[in-house]
Amino acid sequence: MPLVEQKKLALDGDVNAKLISWKVPANGFDKSHPVTLRGLLSMTAGIGVPGFLGYGVDAPLPNLTQILYGVPPANSPPVTVITQPGSAYAYSGGSYEIAEALMVDTAQAQFPDLMERLVLKPAGVSNSTFAQPLPSSARARP
């Protein structure tokens, strides 16, 4: 929420107005029911892709754009609108991927750095990271 508090993002604006690296694909609801940050965070944005399978230790990791488009090495389908935004609750991991892209595009910073600056440090959390792959300094210690 810091980016909303700083007025860099709006909870109720069309996310496509701020997305740069990827756009929510055209769908039958674009004009009258846009996808919003509020909808993404409350799981009412009508976004598909409920979850992600994950990747093996030595498997290549996709970047965020590959995940959103559903292209290799991503192992999930493209993130799309499947129901009218605002019409129903449906958990969607894809919603959080869009929220991540929105933050990264708006702040022009990498997600792990943003989370460190906006969430972890203010909360006093020092032994956690959002970096992938996990840095060796953050791996289990004896």
Walk through the language-model features, giving the residues of each:
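Active-site SXXK
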Residues: M1-V15, Y96-V104
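Short, surface-exposed loop or secondary-structure junction motifs
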Residues: N27-P142
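Generic hydrophobic/packing signal
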Residues: P2-E5, L19, L41-A45
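Short, glycine/proline-biased beta-turn/loop segments that scaffold the active-site neighborhood
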Residues: A10-G28, P122-A123
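Short, flexible coil/linker elements and helix-boundary hinge sites characteristic
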Residues: K7-K8, K23, Y69-P72
